[in-house]
A protein has these predicted regions:
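Extreme N-terminus nucleophile/cap motif
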Residues: 1-52, 178-179, 195, 213-215, ...
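Conserved beta-strand-loop-short alpha-helix elements that form
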Residues: 2, 97-107
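Short helix/loop capping segments that flank catalytic or ligand/cofactor-binding pockets
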Residues: 15-16, 77-79, 107-110, 178-180, ...
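Short acidic (Asp/Glu) patches
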Residues: 45-57, 71-94, 111-113
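A short, Trp-centered hydrophobic/proline-enriched beta-strand micro-motif
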Residues: 67-70, 167
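Glycine-rich phosphate-binding loop plus the immediately following alpha-helix
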Residues: 107-138
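Catalytic core of PPM/PP2C metal-dependent serine/threonine phosphatase domains
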Residues: 141-182
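A conserved acidic, glycine/proline-rich C-terminal tail/linker
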Residues: 184-219
């Protein structure tokens, strides 16, 4: 499966060692890497752990207040730059939204129309385009403050979680939204002036499990919103487990 990395802090914090460890997992997720930092957004369809470009970016990475990282194991969509995460766009107010996703969308007919509008061919990009459509529609009716943005994202993840694996991180230029609906697939711990989130623990420190099936929203390293706990936990079937094991052979 893909792996996700997120960071939110109140002041610039050095995360190079943790980021380097995260991207070393590229050998098991060889189909691309991507990152969003204060230096910009970069993504390539190459192995993260052998990418000279990525090594240079991580080495030069300045202290961060917000960071997103992704390594891809392709399950839906071909292997090309357009299918690598993050996905990013401006809403109608000029706010920048960025998404990384780990999972598969098995059931979501409302995403089908976006097949004709996406740059690549992943379900993750269709998910992002649907998110942007819903945000723009809501903002045409009224401005969305922090609370209303949290409510909207909470409603979206509750709506899309049933029968889908929806582990994701979203950054809107101010808030970091965290959601997982499969147990033991995302952890977090405090780091410096903030909190770091990762699919897998990145060192020997004490990591905690991110709550399952409940949106968590952070601002400047602090939890500012908890969504409604929902029941759409993704429980992998034997077929799902066997298919993922086969892809790693």
């Amino acid at each position: 499966m893909c792996e996700l990395l997120g960071f939110s802090a109140s002041q610039p914090t050095e995360i190079n060692t943790l980021v380097s460890e995260f991207f070393s997992h590229g050998k098991d997720n060889p189909h691309g890497w991507g990152m969003m930092s204060s230096s910009g957004m970069y993504k390539r369809c190459e192995r993260a752990d052998t990418s000279s470009e990525l090594k240079r970016l991580v080495k030069k990475l300045p202290p961060q207040t917000t960071y997103l990282g992704h390594i891809r194991f392709a399950t839906v969509g071909s292997i090309k730059d357009e299918n690598c995460h993050p996905f990013s766009a401006l809403d109608i107010t000029g706010r920048s939204w960025t998404l990384i996703h780990n999972g598969t969308i098995y059931s979501a007919s409302k995403l089908i129309p976006f097949v004709h509008h996406q740059s690549g061919d992943t379900d993750s990009e269709r998910l992002f385009l649907y998110l942007m459509q819903q945000l723009n529609a809501a903002q045409k009716e009224k401005p969305l403050d922090i609370y209303h943005r949290c409510e909207l994202i909470d409603d979206l993840v509750k709506d899309l979680s049933p029968r889908n694996k929806l582990n994701l991180m979203i950054y809107d230029g101010e808030l970091l939204y965290i959601h997982k609906n499969m147990k033991q697939t995302m952890k977090y711990r405090e780091h410096g002036a903030g909190v770091i989130f990762s699919t897998n623990a990145l060192d020997d420190a004490q990591w905690k499990d991110v709550p399952t099936a409940q949106l968590q929203v952070y601002k400047d390293g602090k939890l500012v919103f908890e969504g409604t706990k929902h029941n759409a936990e993704f429980v992998p079937t034997l077929q799902y487990i066997n298919a993922n094991d086969a892809m790693h052979i």
